[in-house]
């Protein structure tokens, strides 16, 4: 990525809804070359898509938690397929350490979370153990990956 690509991804990370004309003005390109650059970043997989950032609490999902999951060795495929289909799970990551996976889960209340844990998540394929941490307050939700990546790349030179 060159300096112009970094400017583009940084600007889009801050506001993915801007027009190509606005983006071009921000980074110093006209509309057509800006569109071509963005298309190239999409084709290379650097830009994976565009989505609205929703406020879970405004949707009635007041409780955010992280659930560590330990599963049996032969259940990874089935577990991952079940997690992909479960609407309460917004993220799933494989982990190193005592657990196999980390899930980000939203619920309407602590009672709803308790129900999800006892009657749904604990029954996913291969689950041996769940350990849950409830978030009290979100301080930072979306970091600026473009700036961080560019900074660390420059430090390696």
Which ranges hold each PLM region?
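A compositional/biophysical signature of low hydrophobicity enriched in polar/charged and small residues
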Residues: 1-157
């Amino acid at each position: 990525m060159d300096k112009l690509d970094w400017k583009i991804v940084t600007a889009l990370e801050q506001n993915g809804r801007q027009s190509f004309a606005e983006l071009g003005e921000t980074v110093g390109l006209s509309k057509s070359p800006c569109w071509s650059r963005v298309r190239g970043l999409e084709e290379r997989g650097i830009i994976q898509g565009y989505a609205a950032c929703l406020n879970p609490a405004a949707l009635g999902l007041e409780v955010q938690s992280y659930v560590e999951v330990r599963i049996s060795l032969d259940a990874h495929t089935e577990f991952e397929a079940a997690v992909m289909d479960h609407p309460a799970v917004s993220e799933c990551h494989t982990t190193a350490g005592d657990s196999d996976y980390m899930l980000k889960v939203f619920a309407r209340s602590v009672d709803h979370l308790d129900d999800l844990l006892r009657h749904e998540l604990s029954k996913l394929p291969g689950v041996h153990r769940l350990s849950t941490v409830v978030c009290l307050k979100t301080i930072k939700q979306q970091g600026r990956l473009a700036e961080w990546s560019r900074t660390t790349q420059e430090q390696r030179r």
